[in-house]
Amino acid sequence: MSPVPSRGRRLTAATSLMLAITPALAQDPAPIKVPTIEQLAAYPRMTGFSLSPDGKHMLAIESQGDVRNILVWQTANLAAKPRVIGANNMRIQSASFLKNDMLAVTMTQPYDARLGGELTKTFINKLLVTDLAGKTWKEPLEGADIARSEDVRRVNALAVPSVKSRMPRDPDHVIVESDGLGRERDLFRYNVHTGEAARVLRLGENDLDALVDASGKPRAKIRGGIDAKGVYVATELRNAGTGQWDEHFRSYVKDRDVVEIASLAAGPNTVILRSNVGRETAALFEYDTEARKIKSTLFEHKFFEAVGTRNLEGDDAVDADSLVAFTYQGLYGLESHWLRPQFEAVIKGIAQNLHLAEVTQPLVDVGSGKRSEVRMFDGASVEITAYRSGEVPTYLLRVTGLTYPTEHYLLRGQTLTLLSKEYPQIDRRALGKSRFVYYKARDGLNIPAILTVPNPALCGPGPYAAVVHPHGGPWARDNMAYDASGWVPLLASRCRLVLQPQYRGSADWGRTLWMAGDAEWGQKMQDDKDDGAKWLASEKLADPKRIAMFGFSYGGYAAFAAAVRPHGLYKCAIAGAGVSDIERIWARFYTNPFFRDRQAPTVKGLSPLTQADKIQIPIMVYHGDRDQTVPLVQSEMFVDKARKSDQPVQYHVLKDYGHGPAWTREVMAQQLKLIEQYLAQGCGGSGL
């Protein structure tokens, strides 16, 4: 299912990258422009910047409406017109360099299939390899001997291989992992120029994953199993002497202990281990594979989860000398703790150039209650996304914030160039101001939250109409990077204050908050959201008579729960793709032992469907017809029953909308328009 390449002929002003950097003004006298629905729903104008391994080329994805093209420049001559690579049959999702002269491109398109006699509407993705001009296209493993039967071969036609290692020191090969519904995963050494593939590891039916070193040799394997204590995940390392797989760690999923290899780049007999065993948050450790013991703690953050490593060559498994940072889940998502002063100096220099002030941010350890303060930039983060050394050191940088639409910069030598404003038409003054806060739950637990307050110059003084906006998951979390879904920018620019509570059950804020949500769906988890609404009113940030709840996925479940709980806090609710029957949604996953053992004790509590005919407030429900994560029936059942209540119910099915991704910008805009109109005119008839 390869696309027909379409090498674009028309270029826009956005493809000329030598743009002047305009310093931010303390006060802009121009009138504040409220972003339109179409501007909020648009794809980023230009995004996905990356550098070739040798730093000589740079690529990005440019969007014009629903059309997305790959642009490729010579880094030393950005003023020249880039090569433009497009696709006719599928839509480009992402692109990156595999080698100096070859790209990996992911594509997507709607797909209808009959599975088990029923029509399934979904999306399919494809991984393709092409050259820098987009002349030749290959589908990795298309001809590899990976199918066990003709039936399995048909199923595997829908599978999406993934690049496991780019092997930066090999000019031709990468490691690709096959992935299909009808077979286990295998690892292949794939030649990006010839398309030839050779299997390097056949994984067994209980093998979950594998890691390879810089030469492409499998060195670690993750295996699942069941013993007397329950379902476990074991980490195995290949014995250099015997070639056998030796088990080093075993953790039980019901305990939610994490013991995993974060990097193989520490040396031949050393790995970097990530573990939260006996800890509030995960940390990184140096582990001696021969002595089978932890040698030292490499990195820990007292308030955030450590994640992994970064290095110079853009591939994790190179060597210890290339490590430049440890990563952690910070306020803006994945952030870096730099090991070399030069990178921190670059970031501070960029922030000064952009007039980003430093502020003091209080932090609280939810588990212990201990407090501290850190310095951070006000309203945005600056992150180095790529670096290449050489005669002219070259950096790619990203600047982003919840009220600061993402921007991309190139620092080459001493020259700083603005590459792209992802949403150039959005006036960020209309988006208000965001900050990270804590509030107390009724049982005393500290609840982290992100608060976005409308701009008084646009909306006047508070208290404001407010929306409590819980994230999905629930084992997930929010961050303060720009919200490309458009939800928070839409609400804030329409003068609604937004609270994003990191309620109990949220992940990556530490073990205490994560596990406090067990078996508390619609109960203490919901109390946390309600306590956030009460806090907004007590702080005189929100008008207590003008508070609504809006969420998607698990957040949609929370909106259903808000509608049926008799507390009188909310004027109305909006549920996007919400779960209404937790027993039915749980039954879909119960046959998976890992999901069952890990989440069975946690997915218990209120099932809103049981009380849908007694909803207490007006509600709008919307759901995509291609959603294969939360089936459409979850909304249909709730709406059918809720219409028997005395409250107004709106219901909308969005065509070609999955569990989040919209196939066209028109559909994306339709979703945002529904939210805007409901809060302006619905919500019981008079708006919020």
Regions found by a protein language model. Name each.
Residues A13, A26-S381, A386-Y395, L402-T403:
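Beta-propeller folds
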Residues Y423-K545, F552-S553, I585-R588:
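Cap/lid segment of the alpha/beta-hydrolase catalytic domain
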Residues S2-A14:
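Bacterial N-terminal signal peptides that target proteins for export
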Residues L397-R398, L402, A441-I447, M525, ...:
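C-terminal substrate/ligand-recognition segments
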Residues Q500-L688:
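Active-site-proximal cap/loop segments of hydrolase catalytic domains
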Residues T12-T22:
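Bacterial N-terminal signal peptides
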Residues Y328, T400, H469-G473, S553, ...:
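Glycine-rich His-Gly loop
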